[in-house]
Amino acid sequence: MSFIPDTTTLIQFAIATVILAITPGPDMTLFVSRTLSQGRATGFASMAGALCGTLIHTTLVVVGVSALIVASPMAFFVLKVFGAGYLVFLAWQALARGSAFSPEKKSGPQISLFRSWAAGLGVNLLNPKIILFFMTFLPQFVSAHDPNAPGKLFFLGVMFIVLSIPVTAPMVFAAEKFSTAMKASPRVTRVVDYLFAGVFSAFALKILTAQAK
């Protein structure tokens, strides 16, 4: 079919995708932290939201909206501020609610699956670095002169999502196993809360320093 790249391109793209999928980022930090604090279902909901954000970014690249955002200094700056601010909010949540699974807080507040999905969506959708990434990553595998380029770009974006699932899902299961051990140690639990808060804050700072190129 005309919208499917050749086999060599697909193999190269698959290898690159797997390598990128295991690279830590704000989205991975989110669904691992949500799994630790709220359980496996919440972790998968966050992961699903992040993948939906990836699909939206793919669509924006295909229709050219991402290029317009990067070309507009004001739009790019606003997106950076909102994206960084959202990660700071998640850092605060990690401290305020992160230890909700500890023995002393069994009746603590639970985050709904929809809110976890929305959090995952927000982490990817408000991250300008993802816009820059998809604008530079996907086009490497499609010729600019190919009349079927839009269809191939979208196909590769969907392929990126499909290949990411079996790579990232085991991390949720691993986090669930780790949370069982953490329940016996409130002190370790709190250390992990601060760890995730620090990681979210670091990613927020990284987003603020992103430059449109």
What is each residue range found by the language model?
Residues 108-121, 127:
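Anionic-ligand binding region
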Residues 71-100, 167-171, 179-213:
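Selective transmembrane alpha-helices of multi-pass membrane proteins
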Residues 49, 53-65, 87-90, 131, ...:
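Alpha-helical transmembrane segments and their lipid-water interface positions
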Residues 18-21, 124-125, 161-169:
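Residue-level hotspots within the lipid-embedded alpha helices of multi-pass solute transporters
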Residues 96-113:
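Flexible cytoplasmic inter-helical loops of multi-pass small-molecule transporters
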Residues 35-42, 111-112, 184-187:
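Juxtamembrane helix-boundary/capping and inter-helix hinge elements in multi-pass membrane proteins
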Residues 3-77, 136-156, 160-161, 175, ...:
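Juxtamembrane transmembrane-helix termini in multi-pass membrane transport proteins
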